[in-house]
């Protein structure tokens, strides 16, 4: 992201969700984004993932500027190269957990058999192997969240965007999620993870703090959450 700003409304009602944000995420690295509610974290993710246009600035993925892409090209990019984990999960109710995870791979041309094998492996790594045949309404909130995460990391993604990926999970399952995201990064995926959890952020290579739509601090975390908490307090 280069000098990205996003405003909503006009004149007296104008709201600056993001202001002149610069953010670079290298392949194989994870960046955690922290900040209070309303600081612009979710807006940053939607713009980074080509789901929303910035008011000013540009977004590049793999060196290609999104502003120069056609609508169809952006759609292909989202389907093939970007994995999303948002707080509402967006699972298809008529598909099982395994089918939800495998669907993006099938849409990208992978055979149904290979897509299912990859999907089952991702679910198994998150402790959901025995729930693969269940529909979303048969799963708990935490289980649905893990299905959404499995769907986001499966396949040949280049960019993973996650909004509070451990928000509905206990500490054990939260760590399983971070291990899966970390494994994706080791395969060369670039990850941006929005979180309020310092323990989760300690997995990142770099932490960015947002406040009122502006980047206020950047740090490389030391092992463990204490360095993040003290870093935020000492800004």
Cite the ranges covered by each PLM segment:
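ABC family nucleotide-binding domain
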Residues: 2-206, 210
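Conserved beta-strand-loop-alpha-helix hinge in the C-terminal portion
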Residues: 214-235
């Amino acid at each position: 992201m280069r000098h990205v700003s996003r405003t909503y409304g006009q004149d007296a009602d104008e709201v600056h969700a993001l202001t002149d944000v610069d953010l670079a995420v290298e392949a194989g690295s994870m960046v955690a984004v922290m900040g209070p509610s309303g600081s612009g974290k979710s807006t940053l993710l939607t713009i980074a993932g080509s789901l929303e246009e910035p008011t000013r600035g540009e977004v590049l993925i793999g060196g290609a500027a999104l502003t120069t892409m056609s609508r169809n090209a952006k759609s292909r990019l989202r389907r093939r190269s970007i994995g999303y984990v948002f707080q509402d999960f967006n699972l298809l109710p008529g598909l099982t957990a395994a089918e939800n995870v495998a669907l993006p791979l099938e849409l990208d041309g992978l055979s149904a058999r290979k897509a299912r094998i990859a999907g089952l492996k991702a679910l198994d790594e998150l402790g959901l192997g025995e729930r693969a045949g269940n529909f979303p309404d048969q799963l708990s909130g935490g289980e649905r969240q893990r299905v959404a995460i499995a769907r986001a990391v499966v396949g040949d993604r280049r960019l993973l965007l996650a909004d509070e990926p451990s928000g509905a999970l206990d500490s054990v399952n939260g760590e399983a999620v971070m291990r899966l995201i970390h494994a994706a990064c080791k395969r060369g995926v670039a990850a941006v993870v929005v979180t309020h959890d310092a323990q989760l952020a300690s997995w990142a290579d770099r932490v960015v703090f947002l406040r009122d739509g502006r980047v206020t601090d950047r740090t490389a975390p030391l092992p463990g959450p204490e360095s993040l908490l003290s870093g935020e307090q000492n800004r």
